[in-house]
Amino acid sequence: MAEFMGELRRTAYCGTLRKEDVGKEVVVMGWTQRRRNLGALLFVDLRDKTGLVQVVFDDTTDSEVFDKAQAIRSEYVLAVKGKVRERESKTNKIATGDIEILADELKILSEADTTPFEILDDTNVNETLRLKYRYLDLRRPSLQKNLFVRNEITKAARKFFDENGFTEIETPMLGRSTPEGARDYLVPSRVHEGCFYALPQSPQLYKQLLMIAGFDRYYQITKCFRDEDLRANRQPEFTQIDVEMSFVEEIEDVMYPIEGLIKGIFKSTIGLDLGEGHFRTMTYKEAMENYGSDKPDTRFGLKIVNCSDLFMASAFKVFTDALAIEIGPIRGSVRAINAKNLADKFSRKELDATVEFAKTMGAKGLCWMTWQKGGEIKSSFAKFLTPEDIENIKARMDFCEGDVLFFAADKDYVVFNTLGGLRLMIAEKHGLIDKDKYDVLWVTEFPMFEWSEEENRYMAVHHPFTAPMTEDLELCETDPSKARAKAYDLVINGQESGGGSIRIHSRDIQKKMFNILGFSEEDIEKKFGFFVNAFNYGTPPHGGLAFGLDRLTMLLTKDESIRDVIAFPKVQTASCLMSDAPAPVEQKQLDELYIEVKGE
């Protein structure tokens, strides 16, 4: 039966006690990790958020207390009063391995049923069961550590913002739906029949309005929501560290101060000094052409090389057809990567599997060329190659004995996606990535627009409030495919950790941007009227960015799953296995909201 604490009050945390505390009388409280009964001697490992400490009940313990201790089982919640003493059999497996507590008072604050799985870091239990009992899963030290790191990140962020003149301001959770990009989560209004709020995908408009209002430097750590198909490391609700600054006009005006934030976070959470200089910068064009991604992982080589000019007159129709592609601004190319010294890892079976992998990345196929050490050059398109072609490939690709080449030929974006994915797969599979390294860089000069083959029009790469580079302003109208944005992404180890832009602060340019994107005057007024109207009353140059707190925590803890750095995450069906959300509601609630649920 559960007891009350009575006069006992905690004086120490379990995992903080050390040899220097020997002789002290302490009160500790926590959960029973395990219990070992040796008859006249009883050991209990007591656990709280700081770690474990061994509690001992022996022949000097009051008989009533000793008898009570016999009832202790795993995950019972205890309050123990006793004296710290040096352990006879020390251990370096836990931080408190030099000491133990000889108990003289015990209260069993709560009993526990047998748990569905052991509360251990190395427990081999499927994630579905863990998420169903998430409150038990969160008792595991590794998950608690992740959330403590997350807390350290927000502490470091708030410290930086406070020291640099930023004001924390909350923006609305219930706003207007502007269905661009991902789908909104809609919230029906009971008061306004047939009308809906939308949960924010980001505080974008509000934070820009705060700059127009004169707050100069704003931040908040806020929830955002996107009703999109979930991928491995996406969540329907996620947390952003959101920033906006006034009187900034060039990308460095935002990037350079924010580097101080990132350096502070790395230093305070994992003790890593990222150095004094500015982070490396790479243009979008460089990133795509060399790494096949706008979030390049540069911890390893395997750079993409353009070989288009080598095959302009090729007899290989796959290549020449790709080079002939012209669809609006879209062009085709032939590009390759060299997996140096890995030819012996690619049997014919492995080569075929690699071709199949390329197809999952959107390619119609993949060509290869391999040169085994001491052997001859073999290729999937050998009959179309002349001796001169092979010599040109050797020179262009630094192709040597022991290497294997992979060629992709298609529209540029297909080639980039294919070879970008392939280089990551090869690097991961063959141990080319230094997992202890943090590679931090900015990617800049993104395109303002991208051509949609489906809609046969230009779409905004980021959002319609991003400013074009000053020298590209005219290109927005004359040749949108060449216009570059004052946009920037922070990439850490091949993960987009944050991104932002300098914003448009001119009313005329903002309207022009809407027009280029195909918005009618009616659309502009309906979706953004309140925002555009604010531009009539004096708008400072401004810009900002947002960091994904979940993603940043995952990178710093080196976890593979974003679910392991969120207290109560959703699974890939956007549902919570613990609470069974989402769930049907009563008809009365639907009636109050004027909602009718249609059957399939």
Residues covered by each model-derived region:
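Class II aminoacyl-tRNA synthetase catalytic cores and aaRS-like
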Residues: 1-600
